[in-house]
Amino acid sequence: MNGAPIKVLLQTTIRATVDDWSIARFSLLGQFLRDRQKENGAAMFEVTMRDRETRGSPDSVLAALDESGFDEMWLFAVDVGDGLTAADCAGISRFRRRGGGLLVTRDHMDLGSSICDLGGIGEAHHFHSRNQNPDVSQRAVDDPFTTSISWPNFHSGANGDFQEIRAIAPIHPVLRDPQSPSGALRFLPCHPHEGDVDAPSNQDARVIAAGTSKVTGRSFNIAVAFEPNAEAGPAIAQSTFHHFADYNWDLGRGCPSFVSERPGNAMAREPRALIDTQRYVLNVARWLARRA
């Protein structure tokens, strides 16, 4: 791959906070991307990691994202519903309309629901109180253990464990793995209460990966891909930011004090799980920049 490095923004929807899911808790993701090199030894990615500046007023970067030099943004919606202002959403939407790539991810119930106001990709994210899934059968509690969290809360497993995912045919470029017998990636980190994503019927989007609840056996969507076109850049809607968090890659990195669920350790015992996760990250980062 030739040319300048792909400029990636890793961004949360909260201010820098020690005891929360601020950008410091995605350091392994950032370092992995920074360490990728082209065949000539040059950096493949130029990575910027940041939290939002203030709460309740437009962020100087997000509100003018379309005027930035970034090729793509990974947005971790870790807020309780107020993480993006109208000006932020407008700037992000303009960024995608001018061809920028977006990965937008959230978590259970209403965590990250400020992304509902993003043009196009916001429609892929269903929450408890906003943009509810039109399929009423999906509005049901899946994880019964953390009773303070209601639907959507798909239980793919414990933090620290991994899940086997299903690539939906045809295999999307972000899920391809030439070393896999099936040609597709198999593993991603688990989380006890993942969010709900689906493909809006009025857009060029489709579900590309699904998982299975370890509690109910229900299938749930993990990722939705929006193909680039003349009106918008490529995008991925992801069911939970925990697929990319330090804690879910390496338990030793710790988590905020409010995380109460007992973790597993399968990620540490099965190297292939992290290899697949990092391959997914690399595939997504290249696809969002249209370099896949």
What residues fall within each predicted segment?
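Short, solvent-exposed loop/turn elements at domain surfaces
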Residues: 16-21, 244-250
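Lipid deacylating catalytic domains
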Residues: 61-66, 211-219, 223-229, 234, ...
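A glycine-rich, often tryptophan-bearing local segment used as a flexible ligand/cofactor-contacting loop or short
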Residues: 11, 80-180
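Structural motif
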Residues: 71-76, 103, 235-237
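Aromatic-Pro/Gly-enriched surface loop or interdomain linker
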Residues: 1-72, 76, 263-269, 278, ...
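Catalytic beta-strand/loop cores that center a nucleophilic Ser/Cys/Thr
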Residues: 133-239
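A solvent-exposed, charged loop/short amphipathic helix patch at secondary-structure junctions
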Residues: 246-274
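Short, solvent-exposed loop/turn segments at secondary-structure junctions
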Residues: 15-16, 79-80, 109-111, 214, ...
